């Protein structure tokens, strides 16, 4: 998935403290903002995606799962989405309770399953190697084309902040 590529490049393919801008509306990338100098811009809303604690967002995403990626919440069986079975509802109250205490043992295995599937730090090593190998082969493009691209696509926020990247 593209998530694995972007995640690997942010986590392993950049210099320490290098400012990195992810241009995507995909909220799966919010977790990458745990890393210093990582920012996200949504071309759909034409706004920076910030103001959400990336640690809290990741934990809730792990608990709730991601139906669009076929990942059920931690209360539901592995195959419920594939088999079209309704998931057991994951309430805000329960998420809050589990923030303040540990995940009950009976849900621990599913929590670990979802962590592996949702947390981009768990992208399989062999995929990370392939991603980085391919990335290093590609020539680095010129930043000189960015202002014209941003202007053409009405990306005013990015145009104003281009000096940051």
Residue spans for each PLM region:
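Short, amphipathic C-terminal "tail helix"
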Residues: 163-165
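Extended two-metal-dependent nuclease catalytic cores across DNA- and RNA-processing enzymes
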Residues: 1-160
